[in-house]
Amino acid sequence: MAELIPHPFGSLINRMFDELETEQSIFDFPAKKFFCGISGKDYSVNFHGKISSSALGPASGPQTQMAQNILLSWLGGCRIMELKTVQILDELEIPRPCIDMQTVGYNVEWSQELRIEQSLHEYVKGAMLIEILQASGKLELADNFGDVLYDMSVGYDLAGIQSDKVRQFIEGMQDASAIVEHYRQQIPEQYREFRKLDFQTKLSDTLTLSTFHGCPPEEIEKIIDYLFREHDLNCIIKLNPTLLGKEKVRHLFNEILGYAEIHVPDEAFENDASWEQAQGFVERLGETAKTLGLGFGVKFNNTLIVENHRDFFPQSEKVMYLSGTPLHVLGIHLVQQFREKFGDQFPISFSAGIDKTNFADAVALGLTPITVCSDLLKVGGYSRSSAYYKELNSRMDKLGVSDIESYILKAYGNAEQALENIASGGVNTSGTEAAAVDALRKTLENGGEFRKVAGAQEEPLANEIFEKWLSEVKLLNTKTYVDEVTTQARYTLEKNSNPPRKVGTTLELFDCLTCDKCIPVCPNDANFALNIPQGETEILEFENNKSGWSVKAKNSLKLEKKYQIANFADFCNECGNCDIFCPEDGGPFLLKPRFFGSLETFQEFSHRDGFYIESVETSAQESTVFSRFDGKEYRVSETGNTVNYSGPDFDIQFSKNDPANTISGEAKSRVSFLNYEIMQMMRTSYESTSRHTSG
C-alpha cells in the first residue's frame, strides 16, 4: 500500500518474546543466525568519545526507519545505528518501486517515509526494544557486546534544518524522556518488570548531515556551524563521490571497473562541492569544533547520482542513485585522498559497498562507523552481517589479536614501518620516548596488548606515541588497501552483471516455490510464512431461485505447499525488493495474501486487495474477517455456529457445520464459497502466528 504504519509498542514486545519462545526467531530473523559477540573478542571502538561494541552499523536507510528494523540490525551484530535521515518535507510521493538490487544497487528514495514525529517515536521504540531484550537475559550476549550508539541524520538544507519540525526532532533525540515514559506505560502487563528499567533518554548527541546532491558548499558549512552552536552536536558531513572529480570518477568507474553504460551527468560534478571547496570547509569546521569542544568528521560516501538508463524505475525519474559494490572503490579512493591531505586528524565514517569480504578491510583502516545498506537487501537480509564477523574473526585469529586496535596495527604488516616513520619524525631516540617505541616494537614481535604496554611506560608521552603510531598505521593501511581494491575483479561489471534467476512462472495467491527469499530481503519484515495445512477443500456454489437455495456446482481448492507466503501491509512500502529476488514474476508484495493492521488502513487503501482480521473479546463470537478480492469487498462473521457472509451482491447466513441445508438470505446471482473458504483459512492461520498479538 506504499505507506508504512508504525506498530503498537506493546504488540512489538509481545511478538518479540512470543516468537522467540515458540519459533526461535524474532521478527522472522532465526535465532541461530543472531550475532551476539564472542567471548575473548573485543570489537569495541570509540565514536565521538563514546564506546560502541562494534564499528558495524546499518546505514541511514531502509534498515533504520522502523522500530523492528533497528532491533533486527542489532540482532545481526550492528552496534552504531545510523538512523534514517529526516527532513521537513515528510509527505513526499516516492516512486514505486524505489529500490533496484538486480545487479549493483540503485534507488530513487529520499529520506524518511514516516512523518518526522513518527520517526522520532520509532527510534525511541527501537532503542527500548533492544534494552528490554537485553534485560530479559534471553540472549547469550557476550560481556563486551552490549554497548550500542545511535547517530541521527537530518537534511537537506539550512532552512529545513532550522524549522520547528526538525528542531523538535533533534531536541527529542537529545532528551526523549517524555516519549520513553509514554511507551513505558505500554509495556504489556505480563512483562511489567521491564517498566522499571532505566531506559536511555538521551538517545543521541551525534549527527550525520545528509545534503542534496548539488548542495552549495557554503550551505553545508552553515548547516554544520548551526548544528554545532545551536544544538551542541558532534557532527559528521556525508560527502559525495563526485569529490574525486569528473576525470577520476569516470576513469575508475567506466574504464577500470568497466561500467561503461552508466553515465554520471556533468551536472553532478558542476553542482556538487569541489575537492578544493570541501578542504576549505573541513578545515574551518574542524577549528570550530575544536574551539567548542565538539567532535567533527566526514563520511565517505553518499550515493552516486547517475542517469536512469534502465527500465526498472518510472521513466519520469531522469536520474537515480547508485550504491553497492562498485561504490566501494570510489569510497576507498576518497578515504585515501582525504587522508593524504588531513592525515588522521578527522575521524572517517564509511558506507560504500560494504560486505562480508571487505568489512574486515574497512576495520583495518580505522573507519568508524562502517555502515551497510545494499548488502543487507540481498538474500539473507540482516543475517548476512554475521558473516562479516566470521571473516574478521578469521583474520584476527591468524594475527593472534583479540581487539580492534591490535588488529589495525597488524592487519597489513605496516606496523614496523609506521614505528620507523614516527621515530624519524621527532621522537627523542636517546630518551624515554625511545624506550616507549622499543617497548611497542617488542610487543609487536612477541605479542601482547599494545595500549596496555604504552600505558605501563614511565614516559608520560607513551600514550601519545601509541596514538601517533596507530594513526600512522591507518594511513599506511589505506595506501595498501587502495592499491589492492582498485584491481580486484569482484568490483567490476563482469562480476556484477548477472541478475537473480527467474524461472518464467507468475506468482499466484497460493503455492509459489516457497523458497523463502522474499522474507529476509524485506528490511521491514513485511513478508512472512503462513501455516495453512496442505490439502483439498471443497468449494460449493449456491443459487437462490423460486424453490429456494440449492447447490449448483462443486469445485475444489488444492494447496500443495507446507506453508504459504503472506504480506503485512502496514510494514510494506512496496519498495519492490522482494520482487527482485523472487524466482517467479509478479512480486510477493503485490500478489500474495495481504494483511492490514487495522480496519482503518484496510478501508483507506481500497485499491489493494487483502484481509483484516478484527479480534473480539468474547468466546461466543469469532473474529470478523474483512476482505477484498479483485477490488470487491466481503465480510465473514460468526456467532456460535451461525455464519454471516456478505459480498458485493449478497448477504447470507448459514450453519457452519451444514451450509448446504441451512443457507438463507439474499443474493442477486450465484454465490461461490471460494472466497469464504479462503477467508476462513486466513483467519485460522493468521491468528495462529506470533504476528497476531495485542498490545
Feature names for model-found ranges:
Residues 1-232, 677-685:
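N-terminal capping/small domains of soluble enzymes
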Residues 398-401, 405-571:
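Ferredoxin-type iron-sulfur electron-transfer modules and their immediate structural context
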Residues 461, 467-470, 484-498, 537-693:
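Flanking helices and flexible, charged tails adjoining ferredoxin-like Fe-S electron-transfer domains
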Residues 25-39, 246-344, 379-393, 397:
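Glycine/Thr-rich beta-alpha phosphate-binding loop at enzyme active sites
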Residues 77-90, 239-241, 361-391, 426-468, ...:
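Glycine-rich phosphate-binding active-site loops on the catalytic face of alpha/beta enzymes
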